[in-house]
């Protein structure tokens, strides 16, 4: 960042501070990851200068022959990665990917069945404060109160009762595997479209460690970061028959020019995900997640559903008499970054919450194995049991520093 340091020291200094934070902290926010240097290099390339409204071979601007190569690479790699007939890599985010799918087959006021936000769904799955809940008539399904897991019989009952035009599967805070084949059966029974939002688990799906929704869903959306370990962005996968309508929904429907530098970074990340090393990485994610859940429970910290099948888990703080807001703040002060999160049948506000969500994708990228993640689980437990004990917190902070120093991040930057 030689030029930035010279021309705009204020921005440069802020970036350096953030790099320092990422290096010094144990990053456990489930939606975050650390991209490779080559992904960042593609994002910072001259492609940021190019406008390219339209699609490869059908642009509304001249001079697109080279960005066409990049977008074709991204699309082809995405299709190979997930076994899809069609891929659109232009969505700027997962939310816009979801919006485009809704825009393609729904009319305002249509009924859609989606997962309750506090039970693990997402804002774009029908929250009343989101465009999805404003434009469409979303009805909810959730998890069982006893197991905190999806009960497909209850989903089926809701579908039969409400006769939705679309069913949305997928979650942002659900630690167990989702049976997309079962969702397909339910959708077929009521004549509904099935959209799967696999944003959080896309990397695990690509690695063959979670059921692939693409063969079952009419539409599959995802972000390209999180477990997929690419740049911040979105993507849509579908059957080839939807190509024309979905393309029009993205452009000119809800977006203008695509971000070609981000699409280049997506192509690089997809290329990385096609390598055997990525599968090994995702296998380590699963091992780390299970070990973290096991360690927390062994130290009297409640983990919802008793464990995890993916990269994240939810901690129920009610038995400890804590709120997510308080726990997040103190954990951050000792160098452990998590996010407060609602839990099923929540009694606190979304800004306070009764839980925290933790994910291991980023620390696994950093090189943490089961031995390291067990140490993390012990550190979290000590903080949660000693939220106001300054001596304990100071000791934890020192041990966090020792641990992060053992796993250097971006040493070349």
UniProtKB/Swiss-Prot annotation:
Matching PROSITE patterns = SHMT
In terms of superkingdom, the source organism counts as Bacteria
- Please report a single Pfam family linked to this protein: SHMT
**Main subcellular location:** cytoplasm
Task: Print the keywords alphabetically.
Answer: Amino-acid biosynthesis, Cytoplasm, One-carbon metabolism, Pyridoxal phosphate, Transferase
Give the record's pathway: One-carbon metabolism; tetrahydrofolate interconversion; Amino-acid biosynthesis; glycine biosynthesis; glycine from L-serine: step 1/1
Question: N6-(pyridoxal phosphate)lysine-modified residues are where?
Answer: 226
Residues at which (6S)-5,6,7,8-tetrahydrofolate binds: 117, 121-123, 349-351
Q: What class of enzyme is it?
A: transferase
This one is known as Serine hydroxymethyltransferase
Question: What is the native source organism of this protein?
Answer: Listeria monocytogenes serotype 4a (strain HCC23)
* Gene responsible for this protein: glyA
């Amino acid at each position: 960042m030689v030029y930035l340091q010279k021309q705009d020291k204020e921005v440069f200094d802020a970036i350096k501070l953030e790099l320092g934070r990422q290096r010094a902290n144990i990053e456990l926010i489930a939606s975050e990851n650390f991209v490779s240097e080559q992904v960042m290099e593609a994002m910072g390339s001259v492609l940021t200068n190019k406008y390219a409204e339209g699609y490869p071979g059908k642009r509304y601007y001249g001079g697109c022959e080279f960005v066409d190569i990049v977008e074709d690479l991204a699309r082809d790699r995405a299709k190979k990665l997930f076994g899809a007939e069609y891929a659109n890599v232009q969505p700027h985010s997962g939310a816009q990917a979801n919006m485009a799918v809704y825009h393609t087959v729904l009319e305002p006021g249509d009924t859609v069945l989606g997962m309750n936000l506090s039970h693990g769904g997402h804002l774009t799955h029908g929250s009343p404060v989101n465009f999805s809940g404003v434009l469409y008539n979303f009805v909810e399904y959730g998890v069982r109160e006893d197991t905190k897991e999806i009960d497909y019989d209850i989903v089926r009952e809701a579908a039969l009762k409400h006769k939705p035009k679309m069913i949305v599967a997928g979650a942002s805070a659900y630690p167990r595997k989702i049976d997309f084949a079962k969702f397909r059966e339910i959708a077929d029974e009521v004549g509904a479209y099935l959209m799967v939002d696999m944003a959080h688990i896309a990397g695990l799906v690509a690695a063959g460690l979670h059921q692939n929704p693409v063969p079952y869903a009419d539409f599959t959306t995802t972000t390209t970061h999180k477990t997929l370990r690419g740049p911040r962005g979105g993507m849509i996968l579908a059957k080839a028959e939807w190509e024309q309508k979905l393309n029009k929904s993205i452009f000119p429907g809800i977006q203008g020019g695509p971000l070609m530098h981000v699409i280049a970074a997506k192509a690089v990340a997809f290329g990385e995900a096609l390598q055997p090393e990525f599968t090994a990485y995702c296998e380590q994610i699963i091992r780390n997640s299970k070990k973290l859940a096991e360690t927390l429970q062994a130290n009297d910290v409640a983990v919802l559903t008793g464990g995890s099948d993916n990269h994240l888990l939810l901690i129920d703080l009610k038995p400890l008499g804590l709120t997510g807001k308080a726990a997040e703040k103190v954990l951050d002060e000792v160098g452990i970054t998590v996010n407060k999160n609602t839990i099923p049948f929540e009694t606190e506000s979304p800004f306070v919450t009764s839980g925290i969500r933790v994910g291991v994708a980023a620390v696994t990228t950093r090189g943490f194995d089961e031995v390291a993640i067990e140490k993390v689980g012990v550190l979290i437990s000590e903080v949660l049991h000693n939220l106001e004990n300054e001596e304990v917190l100071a000791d934890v902070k020192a041990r966090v520093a020792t641990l992060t120093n053992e796993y250097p991040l971006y040493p070349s930057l």
